[in-house]
Amino acid sequence: MGQHDRYSRPQRVAGIGAAGQQRLRQATVLVVGCGALGTHALDALARAGVGRILVVDRDVVEWSNLQRQVLFREADAAAGLPKAIAAAQRLAEVNGDVEVLPFVAQCSAEFLSMLPATPDVVIDGVDNFATRYLVNDWCRARRLPWIYAGAIGAEAVAMAFPIDGPCLRCVWPEPPPAGDVGSCETHGILAPAIAMVAAFQVAEAMKAIVGAPATRGALTVDVWRGRYAIVDLLGAAAADCPCCSRDEHPALRQAGAGGATSLCGRDAVQVEPAQPRAFDLGAHAERLAGIVGELALTPHLLRFAADGARFSVFRDGRALIFGVGDLLRARALYDRWVGA
């Protein structure tokens, strides 16, 4: 048994075979979000032999991630390494034949428009509905299949959106109000629930790549109560859906710069600059020397502590501010210590 036997088992599965494995090798998959869902999916995609993986995430590895985010190590958390970078490093050890392109960035319409390659399928690993609707609209505009998943507590749901069926807006026309949706901070999260729906996502992505039909309906799981089902949420495209009926894509027109967003499961806020810019981390570190605490400059970010909060500032001008829950205070701290 040698390297040539790596994919011998999946090739024996009906529907894949040698031809399907070759399609996987030639495919490009975009994974949006590198948290619990994203890391499970990334690990499986790399082991499956997907040729190119694009991964975008805005966050850094923290100790609380290690319970459920499978690609990360204690050293990553200690260093505050960007999740996309840490994931790419680990995937290179899993399968050196897979090209992994990490992006430490907010997933925005502008970011998606600048991708170096068009993916064959997109996997949702994010923790907020605003980004999910952006992914839906972008995929719909470019006729790309994508696979949604979300998990909270012991429950999770996943659903494939092929190009020949209805989209997310057909099922849920608008994102739910923020107060109506629990978070992993308020409800917790069990890793087995994540693993189940991430496996579904990867299977659906593989099916899309090899040309097999998508599962119709949503996988719903409750790992604590032992309840598992496929629920038929997908009918025909909604007559009033802007994407499917009018070829409009609202999320692609929404400006996202300059905002502040609470991060799921933590007392932390992401703040974006009012205008996209290249941020000189080294020069800013020199300006802060002697007036802030815990100052540390890495190849990927600048970390420091000030005004009772901890900052991680990235090269695109974004900042994660820890120890702050209020969005207005986070914006004020950003303006004070990073720049308006």
Each model region followed by its residue ranges:
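Adenine nucleotide-associated cytosolic modules
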Residues: 1-340
